[in-house]
Amino acid sequence: MKKIVVLGCGLVGRVIAEDLSQTYTVTSVDISQKNLDNLKSESISKICKDVSDSAVLNEIIKDCDLVVGALPGFMGYETMKRVIMAKKNIVDISFYPEDPFGLDKLAKDNNVIAVMDCGVAPGMGNIIFAHHDKMMKISDYECLVGGLPKKREWPFEYQAVFSPIDVIEEYIRPARYVQNKSLIIKEALSDTELVEFDEIGTLESWNSDGLRTLIQ
């Protein structure tokens, strides 16, 4: 059975590990024992270590077939780089600020498959766009994405659905998008507008830096 190491056992990493454990041999790694204790699947091996230490990381991933990165954004890029240098394939969901294409040559030189930005958006939004781009001619693309709690409570009616530090980062990092073939950079939370959704009601949207690789 394939061996997968999931780095990070937070809100998202925990779910990834539990889903994968139904089919694969999974090891979950986190610096917090409390996070690891929240895992429901007894088949998941747990390692409480700090993977910012290269020696620790290399020892943990040396026998695995695939690494899944689910660490906070500030750790994502460097961790992905070190996994590639260890010649391990990696799928990553971290919301880091660095340009992921900076790792392209390194991945090719090490014969590694490295897939970045595999969340909802960026991630699923990119895949949906690519699918429709094959099916029809697209001249404009706008992606609206959000995480909403089942129970909406004032004043924000919002809930952090991934690493809180990255939620904050999403709302302060400059937002980039392409208009008339030119790269436009605006402040996060700019150009607010109200959007209506059936059975949900009125929501507010604004610019955030979520297109990522689509900008290329």
Predicted regions and their residues:
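Rossmann-fold NAD(P)-binding glycine/threonine-rich loop
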Residues: 93-116
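Beta-loop-alpha module in the N-terminal Rossmann-like domain of NAD(P)-dependent dehydrogenases
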Residues: 66-82, 96-100
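Hydrophobic/small residue at the entry helix of a nucleotide-binding pocket
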Residues: 12
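Rossmann-fold cofactor-recognition segment
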Residues: 42-53
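Conserved Rossmann-fold cofactor-binding substructure of NAD(P)-dependent oxidoreductases
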Residues: 51-63
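Helix N-cap at the beta1-alpha1 junction of Rossmann-like dinucleotide-binding domains, i.e.
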Residues: 33-35, 97
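Active-site-lining helix/loop region of Rossmann-like oxidoreductase modules
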Residues: 7, 136-216
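Conserved acidic E/D residue at the C-terminus of a beta-strand in Rossmann-like folds
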Residues: 28-31
